[in-house]
């Protein structure tokens, strides 16, 4: 005999759908009593007020100069300048993301909204008081602006859109438990074709190097070739960060050859990497080895990052040639130089052992 149930139904007559599915019969002998939930009004009022304030801040960003008069927005902007921009300028002595991006954000709502989204989510994930709702709202606003761009728009041609996408890529990594790589893949359409020369526009060039480093990390973790086509482009080293860019290109080409099982190309690139190391003008000013990781100190972050890529390149060569004897040595060198780096951005450098 079906059970009599007097609650949890959907009030359909004669029998609610829930009871019909489970073989029960609704008991309607007593009237339905509805209990009010306490404090709903206060909670909703506070939530609506917070949402309205967040939306107002986003609307104001259409005028970046006015938006930065808001103390919260100014604090997030300053957090980007002090803490986050150095992540992107790791191999850039011109500090393009700290200087050019920041200056351009004063008149670009696309860049400013990307900066605020990234800075807010970073603060929320690192124990600071920060609004995740604000980060999400600015992220959505930035995406709408990006989607609305045409190929001929100046923000595509001058690197603004690519720089914003690089910032959103970092937002994506911090805001989600699993990295969906949406912005990494999306940035691919903004990358200029590389045939024999790098782009002349400074911000476009800086965005390209950042995208390439992200592409390298993704390829190492997933053991696949790069998405970006490197062509025959090369860097003529004139200063120290040029050497870091040069080894970045060599590592990218080596990744393509190693995962495509092109042993002849791997050997040719091994010789190029060895030549790079022999001509590289910087070395550690201190190196000591104990029972733990070695302590390796270098003058500049770009020196440390360049040597990281050199060690990773040599790991790939050894794996491709089935010579794993020095893999642990290279891994220890990477970790040692990271833990004794000048400052935090280098800690974010491409230390790929955890992905390998």
Regions found by a protein language model. Name each.
Residues 63, 169-261:
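Acidic/serine-rich, low-complexity amphipathic helices located in mid- to C-terminal regulatory regions
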Residues 113, 162, 205, 209, ...:
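Start-of-helix signal in alpha-solenoid helical-repeat scaffolds, especially tetratricopeptide repeats
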Residues 127-131, 323-324:
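Structural helix-adjacent loops and short alpha-helical linkers that scaffold large soluble proteins
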């Amino acid at each position: 005999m079906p059970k009599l149930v007097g609650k949890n139904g959907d009030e359909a007559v004669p029998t609610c759908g829930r009871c019909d599915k489970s073989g029960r019969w609704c008991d309607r002998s007593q009237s339905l009593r509805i209990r009010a939930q306490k404090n709903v009004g206060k909670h909703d009022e506070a939530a609506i007020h917070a949402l309205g304030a967040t939306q107002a801040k986003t609307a104001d960003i259409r005028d970046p100069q006015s938006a930065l008069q808001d103390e919260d927005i100014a604090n997030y902007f300053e957090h980007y300048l002090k803490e986050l921009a150095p992540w992107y300028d790791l191999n850039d002595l011109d500090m393009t993301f700290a200087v050019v991006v920041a200056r351009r954000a004063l008149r670009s709502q696309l860049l400013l909204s990307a900066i605020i989204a990234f800075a807010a989510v970073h603060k929320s994930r690192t124990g600071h008081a920060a609004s995740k709702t604000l980060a999400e709202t600015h992220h959505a606003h930035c995406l709408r602006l990006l989607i609305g761009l045409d190929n001929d728009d100046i923000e595509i041609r001058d690197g603004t859109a690519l720089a914003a996408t690089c910032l959103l890529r970092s937002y994506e990594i911090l805001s989600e438990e699993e990295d969906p790589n949406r912005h990494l893949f999306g940035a691919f359409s903004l990358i200029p074709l590389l045939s024999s020369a790098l782009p002349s526009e400074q911000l476009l060039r800086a965005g390209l190097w950042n995208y390439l480093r992200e592409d390298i990390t993704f390829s190492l973790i997933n053991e696949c070739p790069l998405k970006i086509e490197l062509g025959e482009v090369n860097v003529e080293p004139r200063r120290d960060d040029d050497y870091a860019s040069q080894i970045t290109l060599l590592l990218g080409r080596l990744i393509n050859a190693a995962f495509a099982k092109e042993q002849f190309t791997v050997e040719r690139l091994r010789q190029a990497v060895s030549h790079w190391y022999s001509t590289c003008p910087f070395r550690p000013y201190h190196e000591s080895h104990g029972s733990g990781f070695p302590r390796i100190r270098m003058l500049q972050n770009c020196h440390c990052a360049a040597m990281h890529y050199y060690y990773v390149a040599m790991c790939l060569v050894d794996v491709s040639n089935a010579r794993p004897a020095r893999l642990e040595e290279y891994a220890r060198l990477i970790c040692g130089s990271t833990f004794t780096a000048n400052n935090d951005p280098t800690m974010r450098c491409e230390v790929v052992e955890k992905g390998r």
